[in-house]
Swiss-Prot record:
Annotated residues for binding of heme b: 88
Subunit and interaction comment: Heterotetramer of two alpha chains and two beta chains.
Cellular component per GO, a single term: haptoglobin-hemoglobin complex
Binding positions for O2 per the UniProt entry: 59
Its biological purpose: Involved in oxygen transport from the lung to the various peripheral tissues.
Disulfide bonds: none
Protein's recorded name: Hemoglobin subunit alpha-1
PROSITE patterns: GLOBIN (PS01033)
GO biological process, one term: hydrogen peroxide catabolic process
Pfam families: Globin (PF00042)
Location of the Globin domain: 2-142
InterPro entries registered for this protein in UniProt: Globin (IPR000971), Globin-like_sf (IPR009050), Globin/Proto (IPR012292), Hemoglobin_a-typ (IPR002338), Hemoglobin_oxygen_transport (IPR050056), Hemoglobin_pi (IPR002339)
Tissue-wise expression: Red blood cells.
Length: 142
């Protein structure tokens, strides 16, 4: 999926507005994913998955940090996310559908925290971006 210049502007502007909250939102989105889609918990048998868990928050920050890297390298996502793609495809063997589920929960979390900024155009741009990131992360599965 190709991101238009308007998409890139929407994504960058939105991500910049998150400021220091990206990690917090990543943890909240991950917790929301586990609660809404219980099968996603199978990849984290060693985690305390209870609400407010420090392990979930820490992993959510890793997710947010990876997305921050992706935002900074929107023009070359395959290179920027290559190591992460390898990790999820070859070591963790995460079912690709889980990226779509987490993406949905990220959109919901961002909409909850920034309703005024979450216009239809921003929603569409972020959805395209998360879909593109998911595609890159699953590209090595084939």
């Amino acid at each position: 999926m190709v991101l238009s210049p308007a998409d890139k502007t929407n994504i960058k502007t939105t991500w910049d507005k998150l400021g220091g909250h990206a990690g917090e939102y990543g943890g909240e989105a991950l917790e929301r994913t586990f609660m809404s889609f219980p099968t996603t918990k199978t990849y984290f048998p060693h985690f305390d998955l209870s609400p407010g868990s420090a392990q979930v928050k820490a992993h959510g920050k890793k997710v947010a940090d990876a997305l921050t890297t992706a935002v900074a390298h929107m023009d070359d996502l395959p290179k920027a996310l290559s190591a992460l793609s390898d990790l999820h495809a070859y070591k963790l063997r995460v079912d690709p559908v889980n990226f779509k589920l987490l993406s949905h929960c990220l959109l919901v979390t961002l909409a909850c925290h920034h309703p005024a900024e979450f216009t239809p155009a921003v929603h569409a741009s972020l959805d395209k971006f998360f879909s593109t990131v998911s595609t890159v992360l699953t590209s090595k599965y084939r």
